[in-house]
Amino acid sequence: MNIIEQLDKEQMAAREAKIPEFGPGDTVTVQVWVKEGGRERLQAFEGVVIAKRNRGINSAFTVRKVSHGEGVERVFQTYSPIIESVKVKRRGDVRRAKLYYLRERSGKSARIKEKVK
């Protein structure tokens, strides 16, 4: 193991506790630190995870929501210090790893059924 991989592992271990297990189709709420002027505050972003990219410290996930009839997507770096917490609101039952087809859909056709345990 080279020194870069070792540093990545240490950084990931420090941030691991705040991130629960989730995947595509899950509805999550991400609490993000936002800087406005001279002050910082927490902002919630709730939506469906449409993609997840697992690349060690460079891991990321994309969350999509519809706000005022307009689709909004945001890509979060999984181990970023601006992410305060991630909460899974509901588990979705999907058969794909990337749910990009939801971009073309709206209304009832964009719904994802809930996973039954």
Swiss-Prot record:
Coiled coil: none annotated. Disulfide bonds: none annotated. GO terms for molecular function: structural constituent of ribosome. Gene3D superfamilies: 2.30.30.790. Keywords: Ribonucleoprotein, Ribosomal protein. InterPro entries: Ribosomal_bL19, Ribosomal_bL19_CS, Ribosomal_bL19_sf, Translation_prot_SH3-like_sf. GO terms for biological process: translation. It comes from the Bacteria. GO terms for cellular component: cytosolic large ribosomal subunit. SUPFAM superfamilies: Translation proteins SH3-like domain. This protein is located at the 30S-50S ribosomal subunit interface and may play a role in the structure and function of the aminoacyl-tRNA binding site. Belongs to the bacterial ribosomal protein bL19 family. This is Large ribosomal subunit protein bL19. It comes from Alkalilimnicola ehrlichii (strain ATCC BAA-1101 / DSM 17681 / MLHE-1). The lineage of its organism: Bacteria, Pseudomonadati, Pseudomonadota, Gammaproteobacteria, Chromatiales.
